A protein has these predicted regions:
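Terminal, compositionally biased segments used for targeting/anchoring and flexible tails
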Residues: 1-116
Length: 116
């Protein structure tokens, strides 16, 4: 695990763009895990539900941020079939715990992360 790589700001073309449905961009994007954490509380709940049920969050986390552990924790939420504020709150909790965990670790270590 490369902490600096996970916490970095990615180029604009690799940012996460929030949509409420295909073709309906919200005007909100996130270029880092920290920015993504902030946007969870700002974006329309319909956007969170849209991306969550498609698996878009974990795909971006695994492929762009290269944080497979966080992607797996978000994927585990699928079994709870969350929506509305319950989804927003749980997603924010998982991402914020991950950010705190990453920012408190020396970059040379590879501690295990799990919220379950």
């Amino acid at each position: 695990m490369n902490v600096e790589k996970i916490l970095r700001t990615v180029p604009r073309e690799k940012a996460f763009y929030f949509f409420t449905s295909i073709g309906n961009y919200t005007g909100i994007s996130a270029s880092s895990i920290g920015e993504f954490m902030e946007k969870i509380n700002e974006v329309n709940i319909k956007s969170l539900e849209f991306h969550f049920h498609r698996g878009d969050f974990e795909k971006w986390m695994a492929e762009v941020l290269e944080d497979k552990e966080l992607a797996e924790e978000v994927r585990k939420l699928q079994k709870f079939n969350l929506s509305g504020d319950a989804l927003r709150n749980r997603l924010h909790e998982i991402v914020s715990k991950r950010v705190r965990h990453l920012t408190s670790q020396p970059s040379s270590t590879e501690p295990k992360f799990s919220v379950f």
